[in-house]
Amino acid sequence: MKYLYRLYQLVICLPILLLASVLTSVATVLGCMLGNGHFWGYYPGKYWSWLWVRILLLPVKVEGREHLKKNQSYVFVANHQGAFDIFLIYGFLGRNFKWMMKKGLRKVPLIGIACEYAHHIFVDKSGPSKIRASYDRAREVLKEGMSLVVFPEGARSFTGHMGVFRRGAFMLADELQLPVCPLTINGSFDVKPRMKDIYWAFWHPLKLTIHEPIEPIGKGADNIKNQMNKSYEAIMNGLDKKYQGFVENPDQ
């Protein structure tokens, strides 16, 4: 069955996903150039991500959408199990948002330039001033009423377990007094583990759990600590038992 699934990926999925990636990138760039970035910066990527999951026949379960208020901006924070985190959140969260992502992703052919035109935020860690500029852009996105999705671990897990959370997303939420909404991703590590059989996906169900947002309790260090600790705890408790427990990743 494993080899039949790989043949299906090669013969059916690969051509369709390559074409879809080109069309999505072109639609995003042209749509944003023509002015409606709110629509074109989100929906082509959303349906492209949905297609990735569906064409690979991966079952998806989403829990907790009832926790989200329609007109509220959130700082979403999620564990980073694998490459399919992107497709699961983008395709199934059901919320218009911007990503905070590594600067290196700008170099991905077509996808990188589409993300730039969609005004997703590339985090440049080459120096303090560059990091500050990245967070200034994120601040403006949130001030405009958009939500933001961040992986506070900063890198995909090598084990499926959670690593250390960085404070940046929580500092932004504190500054603008926004709720932080934890997201737990299950199954992504099993579908596409980091640095293993890079050319193939494995069949495994995916699950996205949207936890109850954590409202600010004030402003400053205590609020940052509260939102960060409660987010970490909620995400950890939502993980499958085999992936619960802290493991520090070497590139964090």
Model region roles, listed by residue range:
Residues 63, 100-102, 124-125, 152, ...:
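Thr-Gly-centered strand-to-loop micro-motif
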Residues 4, 132-252:
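Non-catalytic C-terminal accessory region of glycerolipid acyltransferases
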Residues 1-74:
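Membrane-anchoring hydrophobic helices of lipid-metabolizing enzymes
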Residues 58, 120, 178:
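Short glycine/serine/threonine/alanine-rich loop segments
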